[in-house]
Structure formats: structure tokens, C-alpha cells
Amino acid sequence: MKASKQFRHQRRIVDGVLLLDKPRGLTSNAALQTARRLLNAAKAGHTGTLDPMATGLLPLTLGEATKFSQMLLDADKAYEATVRLGIETDTGDAEGAAIATAPVHVTDDSIRQALAALTGEIEQVPPMYSALKRDGKPLYEYARAGIEVERAARPVTIHSLELLGVEGDSLRIRVDCSKGTYVRTLAIDLGRLLGCGGHLTELRRTRIGPFNVDEAVTLTALEALPAESRVGLLAPVDALVGHLPRIELDAFQAGLLLQGRVLAAPCGAAGLVRIYGEGRYLGLGECDGNGTLSPKRLVSTVATAQQS
């Protein structure tokens, strides 16, 4: 009986990237585990948490792709958001309790001036309701206990902040930003600049690095596919590193690299590169700028978007 149970839960090796359109009300981890179950994947991770209230692009890394998740964690991101003016909440979003209210008297000009003030290199104080840790404990645990701890402001870059529309006391905005940006904090800061307070009521992530939500699949659509067809939705592992220079090695060089050897190679400027051997993605290497290539992060299987 025990052997039969183990057999039923046996996972398969799946390598690739699933671009998931996360629904509202689901945690990122719950979405990950559902997708992992539908793909019967042995190993999976995600590349940047979305709050339960948020929807949109959540790239999931499977198998060998988990080794390169940091590439997306460090990437720029884009969002569309709705900010409700006149009410500030303790969480910065609609799930929190109101802590301040004020009448809303804004104009198109005042809105655009406030958006301009929040564009460029700015500093943000991370919200208490966040997963950042203090003394090994997430800030949201302190917040739930009614404890507020001091947080240092952190530099972030808002590449663009665009007004999409105004409906009553709500603003629709589009944000293009660096990693580490809290759109909830932007909503709070925007409300304060407008003199009336504000909080986030809707958030949708539309882009991470090279990936767009238009390319993503919902859990409902994934589940509707025949089990054997689902893996066909995966992007290959090297889609995570497509922005890096490409180095091609012959079979002999590739063999040495996979043994951890440093090679002489025409790899140009210093920095990370993606390495291929006879067309196969081998992983990441680092060039020193003087013709020397060192292995940094290599795949341990043939890294494709298909099951091995």
C-alpha cells in the first residue's frame, strides 16, 4: 500500500518557464503549487511574489530553470493599478483598515504634477505589511501583532508613471519600475502628494523583463488542456537569460566547461554570458574581459522546455 501511494505521487522532471496569469484571491505560492500539480513537476519556484489581491504575470520556473530565477527577480517590472483617493489604509490597499480620510479636490494638472514628482530615482519606505524581514521575521508578522518597526528608505527607480484614466475618486495608472518597488507605497505617496490620501484597490502585473502578460496562461486554461499537452506551454530555460551575450562552444570546449574548467574563449567584454555547446544551452559563464571564460551556473540536464 505504501509503495502504491509513493507511485501515485511520483513527480517527473520538467524543465522550462511557465508564464502564469495569476487570478485575484490566490497567493503566489498556492498558484505555484496548483501549476506544479497540473504539470506533475518535480521541482518548481516563482520569480517574485504577487499579493493575493493582485493579478497578472507570475513566471514559474520548473526544474533547471529554477537555477536562473534571479534573472527575473532583478528585472524591471510593469503594472497597471487603481488608486482610490480620499482614504488611506494601514496596509496601503483595500484589505486594510482606514486610518485617515479627507475630501478629494484634484485636477488633471495636480494629478500629473504628483505623478511627475514620483517619477525617476526616488526613495520608498517599505510597507509594514510586506515580506521583508527584520531579525529573521517578516514585517507583516510585526504588523499583525500591532508592532511598527523602523524601516530604512530604499532607492528605487520609477521609469514611467502614466495616468490612464479617472473615474470618480479613483485613478488608473501604469507603472514601469525597477525591482523592489512597492506599488502600494506609490499609492500612499500619490495620495499624500494630492493632499487627500489614497490606497491601492487593484493591481495587475503586465510585464517582467522580456515577458508580457499577453503571453501568459490562466490556471483554468492550463487545467483544461490534456495532461500531455501542458508541458508544450513552457518557454525554454534559456528564455530567462536571453538578454545576455551568447557564446558558442565546440564539443571539446563544452566538455571541459561542464567539468568546471576555465577556458580561453573569444567572449568580449567582462560580464555574464549564456553558453551553448552544439546548440544546447549549458548555463551561465563569466568573461573576465581578457579572453577567459569561467563557468558560473550550469544546467545538470539537457535544458529544454520538454520533459527529460
UniProtKB/Swiss-Prot annotation:
Gene Ontology molecular function: RNA binding; tRNA pseudouridine(55) synthase activity
Alphabetical list of CDD domains matching this protein: PseudoU_synth_EcTruB, PUA_TruB_bacterial
Pfam families: TruB-C_2, TruB_C_2, TruB_N
Matches recorded under InterPro entries: PsdUridine_synth_cat_dom_sf, PsdUridine_synth_N, PUA-like_sf, PUA_sf, tRNA_psdUridine_synth_TruB, tRNA_sdUridine_synth_fam1_C, TruB_C
Keyword terms: Isomerase, tRNA processing
Presence of keyword Membrane: no
Active site per the UniProt annotation: D51 (nucleophile)
Catalytic activity: uridine(55) in tRNA = pseudouridine(55) in tRNA
Enzyme class: isomerase
EC number: 5.4.99.25
Biological process per Gene Ontology, one example term: tRNA pseudouridine synthesis
Function per UniProt: Responsible for synthesis of pseudouridine from uracil-55 in the psi GC loop of transfer RNAs.
Protein family membership: Belongs to the pseudouridine synthase TruB family. Type 1 subfamily.
PANTHER family: PSEUDOURIDYLATE SYNTHASE TRUB1, TRNA-PSEUDOURIDINE SYNTHASE
Record's protein name: tRNA pseudouridine synthase B
